[in-house]
Amino acid sequence: MKSTPTEPLSKESLPKESIVIVWFKRDLRIHDHEPLTTAASLQNKGIKVLPLYVVEPDYWQLPDSSARHWRFISQSLAELNQALLSLGQGLWVEHSTVISVLQKLAAHFNIVGIYSHQESGNLWTYQRDKDVTIWCLKNKIKWHESEAYGVFRRFNDRDRWAYYWEKYMVREKSIAPVSLAKIESLKVYNDRPGFDLPALDLTVLERDENKHLQEGGRSRGSACFKSFLNERGKQYSFNMSSPLTAFRSCSRLSPHIAFGTLSLREIVQKLRKQAKTPHLEDSWKRSLRSFDSRLHWHCHFIQKLETEPLFETHNMLPVFDGLRENAFNEDYFEAWKSGNTGYPFIDACMRCLRHTGWLNFRMRAMLVSFSSYQLWLHWQRPAWHLAQCFTDYEPGIHYSQIQMQSGTTGINTLRIYNPVKQSQDQDPKGVFIKRWVPELSEYNDEYIHEPWTMPMAMQQQKGCIIGTSYPQPIVEHVAALREARAKFTAFKQHHPEFWQQAQALNAKHGSRKRKAKSKTKGTNKKIANTRTDIDQLSLFQPI
C-alpha cells in the first residue's frame, strides 16, 4: 500500500505550543536565578521554557552605553548559552525591540507567562518595562518579576530597608533546573541559529583602548571571587584607596555583579561563610567585614534610583537647578575626558580608566570632584562619559554617586579633592603616573606631582616641555576650589528653601544603618539629627 505524500506543516497549520519565557536582562546566569527555577517547575505541566535575551538597538545608542559593556555582556551570554544548552534548551537571542519580539513569539506560541528579574536600570529601561507591562496587560499574559538583589519595588519605608535587605540575603538560594525540554518548533518559528549575537557598530571609545578590559562570563566571575576570598582580599581594607594596590586587592567583582553572572546573594553568603573560618587572621576579618558592608551600600544606592528614576537626569535637590548648567566649558570637558588637564594624577586616572574600564572608588570620586568643583562642569555629561568608560556601569550607583560627589544632594558633606595632595598621598613615587602619563616618565619625585614647577632647563633636559609635550594645568586648582565653595555658599544663602528640600530628601533616601554623629560641622548641622550617610562611602561600584 502506497503512502500518501504530505506537505511540510506550515507555521499557520501547526497548533500553538505552550511556553513560558524567561527574559534575561542583567542576570546572566542559571544559578540563584528565581525566574528560571520557577519557570522550569512548570515543565511537569507540559509547558516548555524559552530562555530569551533581546539586544535592543535603541538602548545601544544611548549616551551611557558603550562597546565595552557589550563586550562583557556578549562574553557572558556565550557562557550562559552553553550552560542552558547543557540543560537542553539554549538561549534564544533576538535583535529588535522587546515588544516586537514578544508580538512575533505570541503569533506562533501560546505564551503562558513571562518570568524575569526586576531591573533597576536607567530611564530608558524603566520606560521599556512600562511598555512591556502595558503589552502584557493587553494580551492577557502574566509577567512575573522577581527581586534581583535586595532592591525593592514600590518601597517607601527607609527605616525598614536594611532589615529587608538582610532578610533577602540570608534567604536560601534558588537551585538551577536539572533540565530544560528542547523547543523543536523554534525551527519552524525562525529557521536560524537561536544564539546569534549581532555585530553592533559601537565606536564610543577607541578600539585600541580595549586591551586591558575585564572579561565576562560566570566562570571568570567565580574564579575572580575565589582568588579574592583565598588570597587577594587579605589587605582589602588597607589597599583599596590607592590605584597602586587597589587593582589587585579589590574584589574586581563589580562587572559580574552589574550584569549578573554572579548573584549578590551568593556572594554575600560565601563571604560570610569564609568570615567564620576558624582562627582567621584579624586582617582577613577586617577586610571581609569591610567588603560585606560595601555590598550593603551597593543596594542602598540602587534603591535610590529605583525609588526616584529621575535622579538620572535631574538634580536630587531641585534648588540646585541652574547652579552649573549654564557655565559648561567645552574645552575643560574635552581635556578632562581625554586625560589632558595638566594635573598628572587626574590624567593618569582618566587614561587608566579609559584603557582598563575600572578604577578604585576614591579615584572615581576624585575625577568627579575635579570636574564638578575645579572645572565647574554640570554633572550630566561627565556622568555619561564615565558610564561609557566603566565596564561595571550600574545606573543606580552611578547617578547617586555622581550627584553626591558633585554636591547636588544637599545631605552630604561637599567632597572636594585636592588633586596634588591625592597624588602625593596615593602615588608618592609617581609610579602610577609614569605608567599612564609616559610623557612625564623622566620626571623625578620632586616634580612628578606638579611638573609645571620644574625649571625650564630641567624640562628641556628631561625631554618634556610643560605646555608643549604635556599641558599646563587648565585651571589653578586652589583658586578654583575657593571660587567653587563661594558659589555654593552664595547659592544656599539665596535659596532658603534649601533646608526644607534637604530634609525631605534625607527622610526619603537617607541611610538608616548608622546613628548620626553627635558633633557636626559646616552647613549640614540643620539636618544632622536625621542624616546618617557617612563621608567615607564615596563608592560608585563599592567593591
Give the positions of each predicted feature.
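Active-site-proximal binding-pocket segments
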Residues: 252-445
